Design a protein with these regions (language model features):
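Conserved beta-strand-centric core segments of catalytic alpha/beta enzyme folds
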Residues: 1-21, 120-142
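Conserved catalytic cysteine-centered active-site region
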Residues: 37, 41-53, 82-134
Length: 142
């Protein structure tokens, strides 16, 4: 088994925040009811950006923070989401196009809450079999 590690992370959060008060009013329940079941108090939301734009901003943050990350070395892009704005082409292909990455496998994983873990598992399998050397895994939802 190979020694595989996550070498860098990036993030992007839209500026609009929605707390449980909004959802409690909509669903006629208490804020505490939501928090006890989800552990979430506040969510970030964007009216003006689609899922593809959120993913690209996250990757730009990753590259900006980590000089050792060169998009041209990425040979696989895996995007995990439950809120894609289009099925084809997948978000991974739009990322590949945006960063002009050549010779790159693209895959979108639509698997609900476990999607990001599934995407990491896929990346690990490709690394262990030498089918990928620098996969990029992106988790993005709106």
């Amino acid at each position: 088994m190979k020694n595989i590690e996550i070498i860098a992370t990036g993030k992007y959060l839209p500026t609009t925040k929605i707390d449980n008060t909004y959802f409690a009013k909509q669903l006629n329940i208490t804020e505490d009811f939501i928090y006890k079941r989800t552990g979430i108090q506040t969510r970030h939301y964007s009216k003006d950006e689609n899922i593809e734009q959120l993913a690209i901003k996250c990757i730009e943050n990753l590259i900006e923070k980590n000089s050792q990350i060169n998009p041209q070395n990425i040979d696989m892009i895996i995007v995990a989401t439950t809120s894609t704005n289009m099925l084809m082409p997948g978000i991974s292909y739009k990322i590949q196009e945006h960063f002009n990455i050549e010779n790159c496998m693209c895959l979108d994983v639509l698997a609900g809450c476990a999607g990001f873990v599934n995407a990491l598992d896929i990346a690990q399998c490709y690394l262990e079999t030498d089918k990928a050397k620098m996969p990029l895994v992106v988790g993005v939802d709106l």
